[in-house]
């Protein structure tokens, strides 16, 4: 008699995805982040669901409902800070996951990669709308500044902004629709994750060497289940340390002041995980140009498979490309720092140079380095 996990229509899908899945024997801890992202999504949906039970999406009561959650709801403060810092962990895992994909050439699985880019946009949109919900000063002004960018679109811009706002400014209608969309999007993301995995399992995983590993596969369970559990324990330790010891470390103090349309905060800035894109946006003096650069800063990921000029898939054996990759990482850290600084000398010029370097590395230097490496290896 066949084992039920191999014969039952539903269990069979789970078995083929998490138990008997053939996986390369050489994949390192950089391959842990996919499962960690799945767990982050589950944590966000669960904590978000319980927070939504106590939250009210009305401009008059939103701020106080969050205060009520923290003060009066049983373990409400844990839920709130798990959700807020869970978003930070989500983005840390996302950036590492994408970085791994670039370093080891996983982007050559074009369907998986493109769905991943759409997922990244969806998660960023969800996080942005979530930041608006507590209705603090930074929530309100962040929403005003970022939604206002749509007005840079020629001809339809102003109409589009007022349509998004549901009025002539960020107000009650905006908050209500942002709450509705913030609740809905994670479930759409979960469905897209299924598609992401579906495409991945069509090809199988890549590995650090970038060489096909069909001849050397091992079952996912128990080898990678136990490896993923180790990654999970380490991530949860980091998340819980953040939640229990420094819950406001990554937040903005301005968000503890209720939203006031008559008082603009001195420095409007988004959460830390958007600062690199915000720095690129601010580094261009023209409004439309800034918006285009902002979108391209993420959309450029779609160009990476098209610009792959190397005869090798992975960067594991390509020192020139490795140097450029780590230069790109340093550049992104610089942009993140600049995004949190005021618009004054010397931050303006540093931001502009870092923005130019970002696009230059991806569009020009990396493809050229790959061609040079091909010649050095006489390929």
Swiss-Prot record:
It is a multi-pass membrane protein. Heme b b562 binds at residues 83, 182. One of its GO terms (molecular function) is metal ion binding. It is found in: Mitochondrion inner membrane. Its main location: mitochondrion. A ubiquinone binds at residue 201. Heme b b566 binds at residues 97, 196. GO terms for biological process: mitochondrial electron transport, ubiquinol to cytochrome c. InterPro entries: Cyt_b/b6_C, Cyt_b/b6_C_sf, Cyt_b/b6_N, Cytb/b6-like_sf, Cytochrome_b, Cytochrome_b_C_euk/bac, Cytochrome_b_N_euk/bac, Di-haem_cyt_TM. Its cofactor is heme b. The chain crosses the membrane at residues 33-53, 77-98, 113-133, 178-198, 226-246, 288-308, 320-340, 347-367. Binds 2 heme b groups non-covalently. GO terms for cellular component: mitochondrial inner membrane; respiratory chain complex III. Keywords: Electron transport, Heme, Iron, Membrane, Metal-binding, Mitochondrion, Mitochondrion inner membrane, Respiratory chain, Transmembrane, Transmembrane helix, Transport, Ubiquinone. Component of the ubiquinol-cytochrome c reductase complex (complex III or cytochrome b-c1 complex) that is part of the mitochondrial respiratory chain. The b-c1 complex mediates electron transfer from ubiquinol to cytochrome c. Contributes to the generation of a proton gradient across the mitochondrial membrane that is then used for ATP synthesis. Belongs to the cytochrome b family. The cytochrome bc1 complex contains 11 subunits: 3 respiratory subunits (MT-CYB, CYC1 and UQCRFS1), 2 core proteins (UQCRC1 and UQCRC2) and 6 low-molecular weight proteins (UQCRH/QCR6, UQCRB/QCR7, UQCRQ/QCR8, UQCR10/QCR9, UQCR11/QCR10 and a cleavage product of UQCRFS1). This cytochrome bc1 complex then forms a dimer. Heme 1 (or BL or b562) is low-potential and absorbs at about 562 nm, and heme 2 (or BH or b566) is high-potential and absorbs at about 566 nm. This is Cytochrome b. It comes from Rhinolophus ferrumequinum.
